[in-house]
């Protein structure tokens, strides 16, 4: 008796999984208050990773390098010693 052993192979590659197709959420970094804007104490002025902009007068720096206003006043972006700083100056009553 003659026995025939037939095997059929795929003529196209299987559609396997891919390592692409995902992305991280945007972190919403950048300026949150503009130059000349009136802000209250505790307001976030600039969200950043590292010290892209340095804290100036009446501005604090959080643990994630976020810059925030320590007092109520007007925001001023300025250059000091070749570096960008953001300061908050109190409003002068007239």
From Swiss-Prot:
Record flagged with keyword Ribonucleoprotein: yes
InterPro entries: Ribosomal_bL27, Ribosomal_bL27_CS
Region of interest (Disordered), ranges: 12-33
Maturation and modification: The N-terminus is cleaved by ribosomal processing cysteine protease Prp.
GO BP, sorted A to Z: translation
Propeptide span(s): 1-9
Ribonucleoprotein keyword on record: yes
Any Pfam family matching the protein: Ribosomal_L27
SUPFAM superfamilies cross-referenced by the UniProt entry: Ribosomal L27 protein-like
One GO cellular component term: cytosolic large ribosomal subunit
GO MF terms held by the record: structural constituent of ribosome
Disulfide bonds: none
Keyword annotations from UniProtKB, A to Z: Ribonucleoprotein, Ribosomal protein
Sequence similarity: Belongs to the bacterial ribosomal protein bL27 family.
Matching NCBIfam families: L27
Name assigned to this protein: Large ribosomal subunit protein bL27
Record organism: Lactococcus lactis subsp. cremoris (strain MG1363)
Gene behind this protein: rpmA
């Amino acid at each position: 008796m003659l026995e025939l052993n037939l095997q059929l192979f795929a003529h196209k590659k299987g559609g396997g999984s891919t390592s692409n197709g995902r992305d991280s959420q945007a972190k919403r970094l950048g300026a949150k208050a503009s130059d000349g804007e009136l802000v209250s104490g505790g307001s976030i002025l600039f969200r950043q990773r590292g010290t892209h902009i340095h804290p100036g007068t009446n501005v604090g720096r959080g643990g994630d390098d976020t810059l925030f206003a320590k007092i109520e006043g007007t925001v001023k972006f300025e250059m000091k010693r070749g570096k960008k700083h953001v300061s908050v100056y109190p409003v002068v009553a007239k």
